[in-house]
UniProtKB/Swiss-Prot annotation:
Induction: Expressed in the late phase of the viral replicative cycle. This is Protein B602L. GO terms for cellular component: host cell cytoplasm. It is found in: Host cytoplasm. Belongs to the asfivirus B602L family. Keywords: Host cytoplasm, Late protein, Repeat. It comes from African swine fever virus (isolate Pig/Kenya/KEN-50/1950). Its main location: host cell. Sequence repeats lie at residues 161-164, 165-168, 169-172, 173-176, 177-180, 181-184, 185-188, 189-192, 193-196, 197-200, 201-204, 205-208, 209-212.
Amino acid sequence: MAEFNIDELLKNVLEDPSTEISEETLKQLYQKTNPYKQFKNDSRVAFCSFTNLREQYIRRLIMTSFIGYVFKALQEWMPSYSKPTHTTKTLLSELITLVDTLKQETNDVPSESVVNTLLSIADNCKTQTQKSTEAKTTIDSFLREHFVFDPNLHAQSAYTCASTCASTCASTCASTCADTNVDTCTDTCASTCADTNVDTCASTCADTCASTEYTDLMDPERIPLHIMQKTLNVPNELQADIDAITQTRQGYRAAAHILQNIELHQSIKHMLENPKAFKPILFNTKITRYLSQHIPPQDTFYKWNYYIEDNYEELRAATESIYPEKPDLEFAFIIYDVVDSSSNQQKIDEFYYKYKDQIFSEVSSIQLGNWTLLGSFKANRERYNYFNQNNEIIKRILDRHEEDLKIGKEILRNTIYHKKAKNIQETGPDAPGLSIYNSTFHTDSGIKGLLSFKELKNLEKASGNIKKAREYDFIDDCEEKIKQLLSKENLTPDEKSQLEKTKKQLENALEMLNVPDDTIRVDMWVNNNNKLEKEILYTKAEL
């Protein structure tokens, strides 16, 4: 059988799309793209066990990370309306201060046109801020309804069962009567209320509520707040404090726990005396803590799983058309051989080179009698070996994944760089204390290390002008290179040549700083008494 040539097949299809492809060619094409190549059969049988719980974990991991990203993006999002920029209350106060300053400097009220202009700008700023707040509030409400577990919405306490049953039955009957004819409604309401409300709900409520009326289901050791608030005999001087403590479950539990644990009294006293020292420690900004504050309810997972299962084929087809991964890359494994564990690595290396032309994918060593984690751990990734052309499909997938990560990081870095430049142009450089604040409160969260200190410094030096900031970066690199070369005692000829070249580049870069943004510099050489002198002209740039 002739060797299959996929390039020739593609060429023929492009030249004549109506050309029929034989079944044998399709089989060869499938075998070429199928990573599960058949290995040499063996009469021995290996007994093994495996679990596929990773798929369920990946779904939850994706859901958790997606929810965390959405809430984080909402915090950083600034909606766009008629104006692309949105001014905060800080600028509003600055405008008011400007009006007061003008009054003081001129000892007179500014002209009516100036005042009206400033007030108009201030009013627009206030309007934009209000619109942004309203939009964020609406989106936050939507996200919390679907993505945040709220026990008050998803699990009612037992002592509210009676009122819940009554209101549910009444509303159900009312809505049913509105949509159904009278005869049917009468029978439905009667049977529903009789069966559900009397038999089920009444008995359940009676038994449960009787035993839990004076018990907090979420904290059985303590009396529920609604009971305590009715029975407490509080002196007038303590009434305000007791009301504040018993207003929420969290406050009551915290106070009760502190009172019952004497060893905490001194520590709590120190914490209240120095809250700034304790707050960064107890309320850290790690991403794990942030994600744990947004726990998706179980019904969201159910709805998401239902959506995937109901549209599984369509989702696979869409994923296949968007991404390079094939949808038939399911979980699978093959056992090649069994070797003595005392010389495991040596045997594996020998196996690699002996069967390198037949092995399609990477080979991993698995200790018999022990569970082996197959996840994408660093130790597992370092063991991957590629020896032949048969594994090109999987290798391309992994290489593409690594390349996408690099490209995505560079795109994100450029986006941050341009947004930071725009921010400096609009509001000026960062406040002096911002770097200290970020180092104190944002050490483990957010984007770290994408922009260097030198880049930020040069952006501020250039007042947000990206062209000049790049030139400052180049000047710093040249000066650093010259400094390194001059620090050496004896330079090689190549290093001397590099030093002279770098000095010229530095000189040209310093001259380019004076070139306006809307012009192009043209160097001209003029013969002056048999001596060439450089003159510089500027021409208008076409934007």
